[in-house]
Amino acid sequence: MVKETQYYDILGVKPSASPEEIKKAYRKLALKYHPDKNPDEGEKFKLISQAYEVLSDPKKRDIYDQGGEQAIKEGGSGSPSFSSPMDIFDMFFGGGGRMTRERRGKNVVHQLSVTLEDLYNGITKKLALQKNVICEKCEGIGGKKGSVEKCPLCKGRGMQVHIQQIGPGMVQQIQTVCIECKGQGERINPKDRCENCSGAKVTREKKIIEVHVEKGMKDGQKILFHGEGDQEPELDPGDVIIVLDQKDHSVFQRRGQDLIMKMKIQLSEALCGFKKTIKTLDDRVLVISSKSGEVIKHGDLKCIRNEGMPIYKAPLEKGVMIIQFLVVFPEKQWLSQEKLPQLEALLPPRQKVRITDDMDQVELKEFNPNEQSWRQHREAYEEDDEEPRAGVQCQTA
């Protein structure tokens, strides 16, 4: 049981969330609250990054679960600092850290919503993007030739350094973006600024790109368009990174290259046999049936070879389709008392129990999970969902 849930709440996941669920939550929130899209949500973006940095690291997550945020700040092992939110974002989306990008423009990251059918069959989607391009009129100078001068306030560094007192005899040095040149290190007299870009050196341009989603690609996979990102003077253009975001499917769940589904069958079908149909992601219909005399138990797993997801870059090969059977039992009093002996005669015999005088006779009651006494202890006794675990294999015979 975790001590506190603040970091989990920030990412919108449960304390029992898997590493994949944590990654997916960070991806969606980081793209939504990135300063380029939400300039006023810098603090929110920072909190999202801190939560992900802790929960994505097994050791830090264990420290947090046991001691909360205070244990993280104390370091657990002596390291109280967090990484830069932008570095976490860049490393997650494949852009590298700041030092690796210093001679290139910013990468542009976009999320593309796809269905499980899209990832199964492959699809080409057109995406309209806005990007910065070098101003054609001033050729990226920002104004008339010779009008650009070094910023007198920051001396061309683009940053200002302030000394702040934080206690008696204690000061700290704070570095901020220069308010005069907005971090550019230079300025242009307003009357000399380019009319086309207003001195910004770049203009916004709409570009349509075709995104080829190949068979077998997965949720969160990145598609790179090299050099199609924002342009900046004297820098190579950055990349456009498209991140695939798979919508939930009404029937199938994907686990690696396998497809998992749940199928309800009646008790009569579980005992006497069944014949069912399954519609695949490419609109074929599969017919499945149980063998004569075979009993299907609640929760049993069966699989169909070569009906899972196509293997990326080898689409003729596929994983398996795993079916979990859920046996639906009859409602109360579905059979009259007179017919119960007939049914019992057809079923395996009951297990005989020897009752002695020192045993306590108790009465079974209907259970209500919403009762107060249950809710207080529910977290301690949470049970796993009825889902098959990884490692299920089809038998060869």
UniProtKB/Swiss-Prot annotation:
List the propeptide region positions. Answer: 395-397
CDD domains in alphabetical order: DnaJ, DnaJ_C, DnaJ_zf
Is-annotated flag, keyword ATP-binding?
no
SUPFAM superfamilies in alphabetical order: Chaperone J-domain (SSF46565), DnaJ/Hsp40 cysteine-rich domain (SSF57938), HSP40/DnaJ peptide-binding domain (SSF49493)
One GO MF term on file is:
ATP binding
- Superkingdom as given in the UniProt entry: Eukaryota
Q: Which residues carry the S-farnesyl cysteine lipidation?
A: 394
- Does the keyword Metal-binding belong to this entry? yes
Q: Where are the CXXCXGXG motif repeats?
A: 135-142, 151-158, 178-185, 194-201
For biological process, the GO terms are: negative regulation of endothelial cell migration; negative regulation of inclusion body assembly; positive regulation of gene expression; protein refolding; response to heat
How this chain sits in the membrane, per its record, is: Lipid-anchor
Q: Which organism is it from?
A: Mus musculus
Residues binding Zn(2+) 2 are 151, 154, 178, 181
Outline the segment boundaries, as ranges, of region: Disordered.
366-397
Where is the protein situated, by its record's location annotation?
Membrane
Broad class of the protein's primary localization: membrane
This protein's GO CC annotations? cytosol; membrane
Primary gene name? Dnaja4
User: Can you give the residue ranges of the J domain?
Assistant: 4-70
Q: What is the lineage of its organism?
A: Eukaryota, Metazoa, Chordata, Craniata, Vertebrata
Q: Which PANTHER family match?
A: DNAJ-LIKE-2, ISOFORM A-RELATED (PTHR43888)
Q: Which InterPro entries match?
A: DnaJ (IPR012724), DnaJ_C (IPR002939), DnaJ_domain (IPR001623), DnaJ_domain_CS (IPR018253), DNJA1/2-like (IPR044713), HSP40/DnaJ_pept-bd (IPR008971), HSP_DnaJ_Cys-rich_dom (IPR001305), HSP_DnaJ_Cys-rich_dom_sf (IPR036410)
Protein name as it appears in the record: DnaJ homolog subfamily A member 4
Tell me the residue numbers annotated for binding Zn(2+) 1: 135, 138, 194, 197
Where do Basic and acidic residues bias regions lie? Answer: 366-380
- Pfam families, alphabetically? DnaJ, DnaJ_C, DnaJ_CXXCXGXG
